[in-house]
């Protein structure tokens, strides 16, 4: 019988390994993804993110370890677990000469979604992703942001419980990236989906429920964004209207900034204590919590 924690794990990976020649792409990887959360897989290119995704989706065989989706081993019941997953690949897999609707229709047919069932699902996705203005436009004539919306729609046709996004905003400008993230968050809430994100953008991981950081195929850190910031990032206090001699007397690391000084502190508690003990210096100040960057 599963305990309470196990029953909420929609993805369970234990001691996963994958080697390409002499390169250990995935090295004894173990982690959990909770149902309904935004899970972030963070790391630079070559860290092992895409390899793990390919194994999770059943596109690549593992050397050893286990991968379970909703308690089902994805190697023993590959087709069953594949229907639980929708994937947005880093490189779009849409057919550029075909229109948006033609792309979605041909993909839906692979899941047995045809006729009125397809038209109904298409309308639902139009309402969520708002691509009606270019439904009949060839994919090759879409902007990067528009194409990304269709990539997401394609992944959602069969109503998966897990949406995997492999570097979904790479190559997009900051404004378009934000638009895509607004769409993804809306999806997660309205469709009650689990979102598994791979990214090398720190600011995207900052919005996640849980973050796993990879380097050379191994986990080097994990936790909620709050836990990671408290563990690895220093907070700062910017103080104005004081002399450098007064700042030096505090015996903290600091640097000169415009109109003041920026002091490094380990956490909020330390900042509060410092301010209370030296109220005469902290008449004009700004406390900034460390960020994922």
What residue spans do the PLM features occupy?
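ABC transporter nucleotide-binding domain
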Residues: 182-266
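Catalytic Walker B motif of ABC-type/P-loop ATPase nucleotide-binding domains
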Residues: 163-166
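Conserved ABC ATPase "signature" region
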Residues: 105, 109, 116-134
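Conserved ABC transporter NBD signature motif
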Residues: 65-73, 80-81
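Conserved catalytic motifs of ABC-family nucleotide-binding domains
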Residues: 159
